[in-house]
């Protein structure tokens, strides 16, 4: 007995099984975590090292190169990118997709640890980290301000930050605008030398005086007590009274230096609406839950209000949980609207309330089933997985439509009883229903097995589509026949075609008769349309990597010139601030200022509250911002913590750094006049101005000292000495580093630098100018390499012409300069990702088409028939191309997903036609009658399934809600591709069938004739 038969005969059992699955599905749905995008495994590991005060050249040779060379034994490396800059080294290791990144982190840590002793002693230990798509992404930004900033700083550092760091799912808590406290022993070089002290000697005296020592144990009978010498000091006046010398006269620290409680030189300041603020940025871990994390974080902040300094105010400037809830809500809303529209279409065709409700029940049940499957494999509720469900809103009813339509045929044409019709009608089409669903499912199977970003990003969507189609099959061959046997009757099934459909059918039959009579012209027209569309259409379209979304926020980022101090950075920031503040749509803005860059994040309100898009607002701001000098700007439609990413990154590579720099400057100059590019920048920054201290080695040798003594002395005066081994001032709530250095005004005076005293012996000092010369020079700001080859990167944002056009322009300018063979180019950033991902999806599409062919060949037991059916796929591309042109939709990664989806959907109409034609011919009808009758009788179900899919995706294509830009391109692709393909398939496929059938018949006849002639010759010869 078939599954349909069991379901019909045991309705209670079937109902309870369905209810159980629905219950499990609902339970799974409400327990799944919500995220904006899936958890993506990006095989990237970073190695970061800081070396305070070191210039880029020294960082490159003494840190970066040694770390890179240590990785030679690590396997599966795709590329290594390095950046050596003032005071820091960054090594980014990209691995092949599919590797265990955690294992690679362990390997790298092991290899780097082997060369740690070879690194400069004052360089910090390299930090090895795995990069996750989710880790490091900001989930919330909270701005605090208070009149008592010192107390606020202490509260955030000592109380709030530890509480936030203890939350489940937290990745990192970053604080900006709160420079660390320092107890500075501010010295005067001449005064120290007067007391026969060098800064190193003074600091060693201080450190010895405040050190806690373990003394041992004291046993008193039955107890052992640990003895500790407590040298730590916890008051500033205690430091001032530290005894320096008691030879003759008592000398205390306050006699030779000023003890000042201050802060370190600020490197990052925060402002909220122009007011000095402390900014707290939260990011989640790779397995964290944004919604749960933000909720817990905001609850902690609310609970800690009583502990905040008086007058403290705070404002939540970014809450990504709102974006997640809003985006998911809009996708869900689009799905519901699509369901309503699909139901209306069904009713318009069926004209039966019972039948419409019966088919419409299949969709929500199948979707709820799907949640159970997705939950079992750990999928989150995100934009991608929900999109996979939403695009099936119209398609998931197709299986039920086929089943009900065949039950209808058994009741009305074969006069079968309802129970018998439900069972037999379902059994007849079970195989075709499964085959039809499989064509949709198999197109997404390749994505699951092709390593790369495409698999990581679209894995959840693939599973959602596969599982939802699987659930739809189960519902169609169990629940639908069971309900049909109980609720349908002969009266409810008898309907007549409406007047509109009769006109459509009559018009279609005229067209198909003409096409059948003019097969050559019909095929020529279709081929011409295809090639015309392929060659002309793409030239009218723009290319992007990912769809750009209007989330009501944007950021303005400015890269400052090398050597910019914090005060100048603040002045420049105020100019940007005035531009953003005076933009009419600005509701709130947050500003982060450092010596290297400025970031202003602005909130312009929800999409539906304004007429202008966020991109129009950004363009207005960009035009005004061009007038501000001393910085390069870049705008993004997302909040930023100070780092900017561009649409296009053009990498010029070569073994000679000076050569590629000169070449890069020429290309940059040419591109500056191109209107299609905005926010143009490069790594060709002017070098950092250096004061190079050149030691006279003969002189210092004559004094009996070495260069290290001079370097250490200057390091203490300027930087504060050895920060890895500092003394501390311990209070009740914090530990404050104690440093020896010059006062700030003297640290910025070159004359004082030249006159610093260097101790060369007991009571013997010389001026720096006596043993060294100081000269100005321009040092390299950054040294960029990719796989050990010097690289100059030119980056830009799209000014409205599309990424492909910008790429072509960059290549054109590159070639126009006749580059030598030693210089080459490549792509980075989003451009590289776009090329790789598009290539992966194209490869996946090729495999998908082969799988469809294999499936159809198995179904029809023919190698020729699937070729005819697959002919409907190119027809879909005609609709896709002109649909994108009409709607002004760029070609992006979501459009490619729509094309892959189409490959599995559009063939279903051709399958229906060919299958029915074959059925008619097996019943003894001639070819022409079989074709014409099949076209007439299959028109209604083909149009019905097409229109339910098209109207089911219409809300997504309209793109009205938050985040709708993300899936709009895919919906447009499916709607136009399926619509055009259906119209053209109804005409071309019957013609192709006839042409191929005539050809194969003639070929078989010819082979038989040749065979018969051979046999006759053999008989005659015999």
Predicted regions: what they are:
Residues 59-131, 190-211, 232, 567-644, ...:
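Solvent-exposed, membrane-proximal periplasmic/extracellular interface segments of envelope transport
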Residues 6, 37, 45-48, 90, ...:
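Extracytoplasmic/periplasmic membrane-proximal domains and adjacent transmembrane bundles
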């Amino acid at each position: 007995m078939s599954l349909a038969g069991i379901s019909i005969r045991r309705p209670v059992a079937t109902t309870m099984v369905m209810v159980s699955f629905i219950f499990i599905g609902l339970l799974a749905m409400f327990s799944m975590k919500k995220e904006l995008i899936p958890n993506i495994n990006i095989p990237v590991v970073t190695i970061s090292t800081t070396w305070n005060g070191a210039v880029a050249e020294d960082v490159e040779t003494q840190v970066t190169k040694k770390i890179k060379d240590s990785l030679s034994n690590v396997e599966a490396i795709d590329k290594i990118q390095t950046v050596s800059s003032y005071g820091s080294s960054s090594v980014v290791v990209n691995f092949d997709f599919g590797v265990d990144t955690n294992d690679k982190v362990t390997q790298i840590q092991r290899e780097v640890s082997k060369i740690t002793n070879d690194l400069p002693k004052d360089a910090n230990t390299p930090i090895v980290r795995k990069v996750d798509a989710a880790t490091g992404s900001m989930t919330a930004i909270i701005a605090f301000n208070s009149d008592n900033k010192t107390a606020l700083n202490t509260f955030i550092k000592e109380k709030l930050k530890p509480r936030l760091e203890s939350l489940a799912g937290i990745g990192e808590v970053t604080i900006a605008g709160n420079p660390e406290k320092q107890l500075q022993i501010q010295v005067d070089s001449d005064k120290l030398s007067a007391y026969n002290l060098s800064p190193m000697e003074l600091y060693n005296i201080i450190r010895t005086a405040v050190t806690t020592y373990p003394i041992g144990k004291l046993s008193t009978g039955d107890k052992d007590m640990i003895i500790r010498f407590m040298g730590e000091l916890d008051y500033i006046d205690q430091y001032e009274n530290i005894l320096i010398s008691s030879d003759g006269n008592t000398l205390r620290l306050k006699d030779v230096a000023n003890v000042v409680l201050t802060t370190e030189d600020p490197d990052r300041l925060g402002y909220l609406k122009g007011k000095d603020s402390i900014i707290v940025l939260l990011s989640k871990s790779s397995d964290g839950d944004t919604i749960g994390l933000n909720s817990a974080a905001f609850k902690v902040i609310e609970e800690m209000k009583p502990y905040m300094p008086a007058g403290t105010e705070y404002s939540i400037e970014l809450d990504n949980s709102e974006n997640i809830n809003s985006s998911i809500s809009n996708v869900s809303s689009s799905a519901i609207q699509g369901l309503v529209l699909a139901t209306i279409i069904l009713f318009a065709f069926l004209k039966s309330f019972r039948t419409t409700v019966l088919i419409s029940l299949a969709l929500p049940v199948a979707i709820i089933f799907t949640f159970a499957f997705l939950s079992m494999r750990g999928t989150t509720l995100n934009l991608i997985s929900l999109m996979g469900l939403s695009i099936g809103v119209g398609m998931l009813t197709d299986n039920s439509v086929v089943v009900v339509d065949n039950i209808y045929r058994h009741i009305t044409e074969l006069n079968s009883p309802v129970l018998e019709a439900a069972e037999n009608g379902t059994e007849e089409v079970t195989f075709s229903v499964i085959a039809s669903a499989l064509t949709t499912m198999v197109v997404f199977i390749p994505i699951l097995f092709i390593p790369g970003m495409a698999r990581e990003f679209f894995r959840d969507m693939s599973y959602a589509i596969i599982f939802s189609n699987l659930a739809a099959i189960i519902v169609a061959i169990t629940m639908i026949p069971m309900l049909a046997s109980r609720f349908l009757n002969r009266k409810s099934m008898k309907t007549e075609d409406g007047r509109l459909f009769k006109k459509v059918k009559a018009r279609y039959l005229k067209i198909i008769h003409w096409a059948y009579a003019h097969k050559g012209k019909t095929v020529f027209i279709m081929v011409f349309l295809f090639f015309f569309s392929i060659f002309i259409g793409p030239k009218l379209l723009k290319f992007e990597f990912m769809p750009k979304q209007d989330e009501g926020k944007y950021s303005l980022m400015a890269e400052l010139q090398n050597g910019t101090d914090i005060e100048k950075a603040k002045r420049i920031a105020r100019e940007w601030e005035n531009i953003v503040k005076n933009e009419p749509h600005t509701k709130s803005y947050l500003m982060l200022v450092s010596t290297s860059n400025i970031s202003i994040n602005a909130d312009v309100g929800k999409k539906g509250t304004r007429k202008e898009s966020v991109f129009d607002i950004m363009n207005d701001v960009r035009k005004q911002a061009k007038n501000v000098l001393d910085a390069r700007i870049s705008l993004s439609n997302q909040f930023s913590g100070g780092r900017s990413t561009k649409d296009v990154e053009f990498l010029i590579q070569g073994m000679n750094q000076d050569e590629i720099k000169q070449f890069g400057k020429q290309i940059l100059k040419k591109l500056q006049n191109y209107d299609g590019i905005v926010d143009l920048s490069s790594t060709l920054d002017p070098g950092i101005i250096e004061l190079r201290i050149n030691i006279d080695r003969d002189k210092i040798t004559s004094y009996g000292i070495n260069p290290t003594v001079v370097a250490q002395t200057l390091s203490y005066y300027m930087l504060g000495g050895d920060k890895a081994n500092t003394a501390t001032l311990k209070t009740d709530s914090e530990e404050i580093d104690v440093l020896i250095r010059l006062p700030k005004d003297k640290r910025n005076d070159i004359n004082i630098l030249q006159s610093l005293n260097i101790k060369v012996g007991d009571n013997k000092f010389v001026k720096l100018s006596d043993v060294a010369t100081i000269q100005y020079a321009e040092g390299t700001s950054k040294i960029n390499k990719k796989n050990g080859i010097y690289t100059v990167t030119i980056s830009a944002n799209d000014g409205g012409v599309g990424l492909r056009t910008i790429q072509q322009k960059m290549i054109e300018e590159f070639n126009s300069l006749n580059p030598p063979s030693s210089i080459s180019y490549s792509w980075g950033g989003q451009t590289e990702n776009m090329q790789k991902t598009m290539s992966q999806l194209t490869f996946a599409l090729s495999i998908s088409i082969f799988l469809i062919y294999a499936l159809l060949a198995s179904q029809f037991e023919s190698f020729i028939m699937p070729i005819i059916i697959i002919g409907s796929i190119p027809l879909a591309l005609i609709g896709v191309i002109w649909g994108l042109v009409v709607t002004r939709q760029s070609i992006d990664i979501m459009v490619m997903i729509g094309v892959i989806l189409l490959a599995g959907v559009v063939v279903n109409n051709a399958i229906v036609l060919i299958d029915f034609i074959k059925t008619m011919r097996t019943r003894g009808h001639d070819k022409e009658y079989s074709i014409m009758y099949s076209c007439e009788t299959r028109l209604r179900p083909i149009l019905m399934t097409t229109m339910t899919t098209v109207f089911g995706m219409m809300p997504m294509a309209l793109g009205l809600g938050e985040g709708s830009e993300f899936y709009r391109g895919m919906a447009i692709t499916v709607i136009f591709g399926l619509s055009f393909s259906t119209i053209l398939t109804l005409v071309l496929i019957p013609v192709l069938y006839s042409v191929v059938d005539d050809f194969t018949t003639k070929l078989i006849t010819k082979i038989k004739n040749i065979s018969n002639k051979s046999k006759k010759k053999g008989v005659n010869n015999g």
